[in-house]
């Protein structure tokens, strides 16, 4: 993680990591300087720091779950990416997702050339933090093909957004987050174009 000292972008595909303090320090320093971040799928719950004496314990995904007044509620996921792990949304491996691009965001550079976005990975429940701009809502489908019918009992939820974070103290940084991004999702041309544009 020392490469973050000079990195132009941090792209995350993480889940429940517990890095030593000296490794986490590189991530925190990068965030403090306002480095841009792209977070995919399980990165909403990137850290599960179990050591009670860890310097960066507040970055754990469920920080403040038992104390809503805690500093940095929801940890890295909520405070940096815009949402932490809440739950699966739909039945994983039997329901897929169609991404519905938001008409008022179609001129955003991340959506340039993006169409027909479908993700094989199941959805996540998400309600992005205030200040986030939703680019796409997820429509859960009853099946594992792009032409599967919508699941009638599932409302559309945010699945891709951008925002600006700011550490205290620190500089503001840009973020793109999607609750999709499993390897098979990248096989879809529309999803792949969105991912490329976000970087």
PLM segments and residue spans:
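Glycine-rich phosphate/pyrophosphate-binding beta-alpha loops
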Residues: 179-185
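A glycine-rich, often tryptophan-bearing local segment used as a flexible ligand/cofactor-contacting loop or short
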Residues: 12, 16-112
